[in-house]
């Protein structure tokens, strides 16, 4: 991506859309510090977490992340996987209710490796959402095509959770083609047009780059 700037504030849901290969996943992965910058910077809560000079700093607080790849530990159970997310956030939270809400309550104690692809995707989505569910303070949540592989009921539940988290003041960035998720947006960003959004004093996340690998 070149000459790209984007910010998301507390209580906002920015949805990235556009044709395949336009850079939606690049934005998400750069925001998560998974891709290097040739120039520019990424900030969380006003603190630069990486830049084109190679500097890297830990974010001020944990953030939620669901990538296109599920990135789960196959030897862990569903409960262990989500419990680890809660522990990273330094919070206490009973995951039973949210596990049940995605109709995988009966698989709670099963290993990730034994789940179907759709069930694994539900766990990956919950892993990205839980940091917002456990924290009263505004949290950044990054979701890369979270609807991929989900059944209709799960997508409906995902939409409900996104609305809930946004109303609680969390900052959400979603890359998607799904029209149901587009309706969650407080701002749409078409990467094929790549219009710049000016940051405000309440910004939770900002990325500015003139080039990206």
PLM region spans:
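Conserved beta-strand
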Residues: 1-9, 40
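The feature captures the beta-strand-to-loop junction immediately N-terminal to the Walker
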Residues: 17-19
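Helix-to-loop junction immediately C-terminal to a conserved catalytic motif
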Residues: 32
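Conserved ABC transporter NBD signature motif
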Residues: 40-52, 57-59
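Q-loop/switch helix immediately C-terminal to the Walker
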Residues: 69, 74-90
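Conserved ABC ATPase "signature" region
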Residues: 92-107
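Conserved ABC ATPase signature
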Residues: 111-118
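Walker B catalytic motif
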Residues: 145-146
């Amino acid at each position: 991506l070149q000459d790209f700037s984007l910010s998301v504030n507390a209580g906002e849901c920015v949805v990235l859309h556009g044709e395949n290969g336009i850079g939606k996943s690049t934005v998400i992965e750069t925001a998560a510090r998974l891709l290097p910058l040739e120039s520019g910077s990424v900030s969380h809560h006003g603190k630069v977490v990486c830049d084109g000079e190679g500097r890297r700093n830990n974010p001020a607080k944990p953030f939620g992340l669901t990538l296109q790849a599920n990135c789960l530990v196959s030897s862990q159970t569903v409960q262990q996987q989500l419990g680890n997310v809660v522990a990273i956030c330094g919070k206490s939270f009973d995951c039973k209710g949210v596990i049940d809400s995605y109709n995988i309550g009966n698989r709670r104690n099963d290993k990730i490796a034994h789940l179907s692809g759709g069930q694994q995707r539900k766990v990956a989505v919950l892993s990205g959402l839980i940091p917002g569910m456990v924290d009263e303070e505004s949290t950044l949540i990054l979701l890369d095509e979270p609807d991929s592989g989900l059944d209709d009921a799960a997508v409906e539940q995902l939409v409900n959770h996104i609305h809930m988290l946004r109303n609680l003041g969390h900052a959400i960035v979603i890359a998607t083609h799904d029209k149901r998720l587009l309706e969650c947006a407080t701002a749409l960003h078409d990467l094929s047009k790549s219009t710049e959004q000016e940051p405000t004093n309440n910004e939770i996340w900002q990325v500015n780059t003139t080039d990206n690998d």
